Swiss-Prot record:
Subunit structure: Interacts with UQCC2. Interacts with UQCC3. Forms a complex, named COMB/coordinator of mitochondrial CYTB biogenesis, composed of UQCC1, UQCC2, UQCC4, UQCC5 and UQCC6; stabilizes nascent cytochrome b/MT-CYB and promotes its membrane insertion. Forms a complex, named COMA, composed of UQCC1, UQCC2 and UQCC4; activates MT-CYB translation. Forms a complex, named COMC, composed of UQCC1, UQCC2; UQCC3 and UQCC4; mediates MT-CYB hemylation and association with the first nuclear-encoded CIII subunit UQCRQ.
Domain of life: Eukaryota
Biological function: Required for the assembly of the ubiquinol-cytochrome c reductase complex (mitochondrial respiratory chain complex III or cytochrome b-c1 complex). Involved in cytochrome b translation and/or stability.
GO BP terms, alphabetized: mitochondrial respiratory chain complex III assembly
Pfam families (UniProt xref): Ubiq_cyt_C_chap
Tissue specificity comment: In the brain it is restricted to the olfactory bulb, the hippocampus, the piriform cortex and the Purkinje cells.
Organism: Mus musculus
Protein name per UniProt: Ubiquinol-cytochrome c reductase complex assembly factor 1
Lineage: Eukaryota, Metazoa, Chordata, Craniata, Vertebrata
Coiled-coil intervals, chain numbering: none
GO cellular component, one term: cytoplasmic vesicle
Family indicated by similarity: Belongs to the CBP3 family.
Induction: Repressed by bFGF; in embryonic stem cells.
Subcellular location: Mitochondrion inner membrane; Cytoplasmic vesicle
Amino acid sequence: MALLVRVLRNQTSISQWVPVCSQLVSVSPTQRQWSSTSQWLQKNQSRVCLGSEQTVGADTAQNRKYHNTSKLLTTQDFPQPVEEKVGPFTKIIEAMGFTGPLKYSKWKIKIAALRMYTSCVEKTDFEEFFLRCQMPDTFNSWFLITLLHVWMCLVRMKQEGRTGKYMCRIIVHFMWEDVEQRGRVMGVNSYILKKNMALMTNNFYAAILGYDEGILSDDHGLAAALWRTFFNQKCEDPRQLELLVEYVRKQMQYLDSMNGEDLLLTGEVRWRPLVEKNPQSILKPHAPTYNDEGL
């Protein structure tokens, strides 16, 4: 008590209360030993906890650094056609309706386009289409068959960038020139021919749109497009539709297997038969040879 009174009189600071008060309570040697031991355990536990937290943090950082999640494939992950780099001057020229510089000279592309359209007309077995699809041997039937093959060529050549698109325009130009020339040879009146040409032009763009939608969808969509355009909604035998869908699919596969550079330079296309006798031959296309000697 005397010690407590002395402390109060001297107004000992708070920091001095702890050692002073510890003298008020008698502590045995055993308790002192346990207190020192508990303090040592607490210090070691705190060090261990800090070490474990640091270790866990390091492991987590390491795991976050080297952990790879499974990536879902999207359309952008697959190989896409490389777009041509076009300068601003070329963009301005093409926006005005002119054709900018191309990969090859225009006269070579025009010759290749003429050859490709000629292959659509001369290398197609029209008699087989007339027989198996039960089509009348008329000018309209010829136009529908030619239109189908020209469309397949357009789909293939559009994959070859700006040069391929320019070639597509030339192919369509040669097609309309041929249609007009055949109409005159048949003796069709010029007024009626002009009227029919306008009607066929509308049907052409409608058919291209329908075929594009059909080739990008399943066989049902392609069959519907062929039924509307090729058969003029008059096909009653589903086997004819099945045959034509199979023909378009295998022909597009065959065209895709051809080298784009060869097609741009030669324009030579080999058409598969309507009824395939050797399906394995589709995977082995013949490479055309380019020869511009004398041109």
